[in-house]
């Protein structure tokens, strides 16, 4: 019996090769991608790249997601294969094979599949490893080089991950054998789906959960809380999608059946009857396609937007080659650090900016009346942030005079309510808004709050000392900023950055010994070289992961579509043969097939685009934290991604529908 199950395991894989080809290809690809991610994560050459820590962190997180996604894809493909082999397994049982023999046969099939796919997958991964590393270097802005990245410890990690996945396959398939008797196995692949219960309640529940998920996605305004809300919204939308496909589609089909003028036409009757016959199975598959498609779109839109927006973020976060920023320190300390740096480095200055300003958070806002947090009050994330400049500083930055009087201010604001106001009250002090300004600090002074809150304002006051006195006792912070552009910013950039850090630390030690107040003084140094390196590492790594996750999600989408077409093609073949025998011609058969396939497989695409439309606001808030500050750019990226995905989806549809037509026409 041992030799018999060996022969059967091998012959079954050959005989069912049409089912196993896409399954094997998908498994090889996910193994290769997992190998590449593991190899890159362990790659010692990453330390040589700028922003190495950010790249390692992103790749490490990506590896976990890739491993989980790979397991889901393999399990899903296996479920379709085993479903279509139910009749075959039942026949073996009727012919005398016991369940333990069947289990032994399936175990050996899985071992053969595992050995072949792991061998080929690791081989493909190792083959493309150098090329993918060069691609990672390219997208993070480093010089490319095909450096050997082979790590011996990569293979055991990949083997352990997929040993767990294949072991789970064996358990799932074994459980399937245990719970079904031979007669059930022979009929399992052919039986229709039971009509669901409480369909109207499920439909309403689906609409409710999806609607609330959409509401969460649209109502969140804070980028920090958006991440938490995003996961809750995703769970609700996934649940709502499954409920609507499971119950909502059946309710709609039942309503169409009651509409006699529509239903009693050959093409419509056949399509609707086929869908109703197996709606529960269709519902799970279609909802899965919709969710996977949404994942592809959201992942690509987010990753591509982050990558496309990095130049805008760099210009905002690092407007100068070298900067020193101080809080609760006199401007002379900030200037001293920069002067010492320029003296010791020998850099020639092209442009220099020196600014002192205040910033504070708004606790409450009632129309144009604003309340600042008090000095000893426990802080929470503010509703809005204000940066306050004197009119002398404004003239220094813009070259323009405002000529403000004692009760006048000028304002640039992202606050929708304040944009239409002629006056503003800050802690009970009223000011007339003389002029609405453009963003006058962009490219000159970094605003660190743009990635935290979308509601921020720049206030210009006639005299900074008088204004500070008017808000005495509130939680305000004085900041000083000195930034310089040098003649040759690329010359010894790393050495200069280290020197600036060293001088800043030295000045901080002196200030710490002179000051005992709380909060204490703080000085930080930055260089565009460091910021750009960290940004390229994080953004490039994010895009890299986004591309490969999208490949995995797209692979899952294609697999689900293909296996649905193939499995339903075999199920429908006998029914279409009967219809042809009772008078349905080939043209009517093709029209019926086309209509059914169009309805079934473009419905998930419509849902995916709707999901993306409602998730767009939340995605824009989340990527804002990472530095995407240009909404127009993100919109263009989204349109391009949707267009490319639509074309890919149509291509998959065309190829799989041909397979379906070929099967039912046999």
Regions found by a protein language model. Give the residues of each.
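Basic-flanked hydrophobic alpha-helices used for secretion and membrane insertion
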Residues: 313-314, 320-325, 331-555
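Short cytosolic juxtamembrane segments of multi-pass membrane proteins
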Residues: 3-4, 179-193, 570-574, 661-666
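Hydrophobic alpha-helical transmembrane segments of multi-pass inner-membrane transport and secretion
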Residues: 18-45, 53-90, 110-124, 202-204, ...
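Alpha-helical transmembrane segments and their immediate juxtamembrane interface regions
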Residues: 154, 231, 235-254, 311-337, ...
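Hydrophobic alpha-helical segments
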Residues: 112-256
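Short helix-loop junctions at transmembrane helix boundaries
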Residues: 39-53, 122-155, 211-228, 603-666
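N-terminal Sec/SRP start-transfer signal
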Residues: 1-31, 195-200, 209, 244-293, ...
